[in-house]
């Protein structure tokens, strides 16, 4: 909740992650906040907050909280952190919700149609509508389809880089 976040913020914590769906038991969004106690902690806080700020334009469309997350520099190009997240989504088991910002930046970078991904993320179609449009049945089949479209876009953008990150993701399984 916003009052709970204000409390932690007044204690010096900085928000670095927030879930995209409220928890069923509490109705609150999951969140992670950091209070750095060392130079390394400050570096971690800075990097994590920058990542959240970069993803916030897309996350706030799904989160019903009026939070100000400053620090987005407007850069929508794909960086190495995005490639790692996208490889985790396309070639491993990273959830779509945990990859929203990177997926949105991928859609901006790719000129492929990617109808299921664009339908859900850019046109805000329901998963059921995306599955019907893609000709697949069920949430698991749709997720496989989204992963496939993501892999296609990565391959199209940079085949060598895609192979590197695919191999990296598969080495972790």
List the model feature ranges, each with a label.
Residues 1-173:
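Terminal substrate-recognition subdomain of acyl/acetyltransferases
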């Amino acid at each position: 909740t916003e009052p709970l976040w204000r409390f932690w913020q007044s204690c010096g914590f900085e928000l670095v992650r927030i879930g995209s769906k409220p928890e069923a038991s509490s109705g609150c969004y999951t969140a992670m906040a950091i209070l750095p106690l060392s130079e390394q902690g400050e570096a971690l806080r800075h990097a994590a907050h920058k990542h959240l700020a970069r993803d916030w334009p897309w996350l706030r469309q799904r989160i019903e909280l009026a939070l100000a997350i400053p620090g987005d520099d407007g850069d929508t190009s794909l960086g190495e952190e995005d490639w790692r997240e996208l490889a985790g989504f396309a070639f491993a088991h990273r959830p779509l919700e945990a990859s929203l910002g990177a997926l949105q930046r991928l859609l901006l970078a790719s000129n492929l149609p990617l109808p299921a991904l664009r339908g859900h993320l850019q046109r805000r179609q329901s998963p059921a509508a995306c599955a019907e449009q893609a000709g697949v049945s069920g949430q698991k089949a749709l997720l496989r389809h989204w992963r496939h479209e993501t892999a296609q876009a990565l391959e199209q953008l940079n085949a060598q880089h895609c192979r590197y990150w695919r191999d990296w993701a598969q080495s972790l399984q």
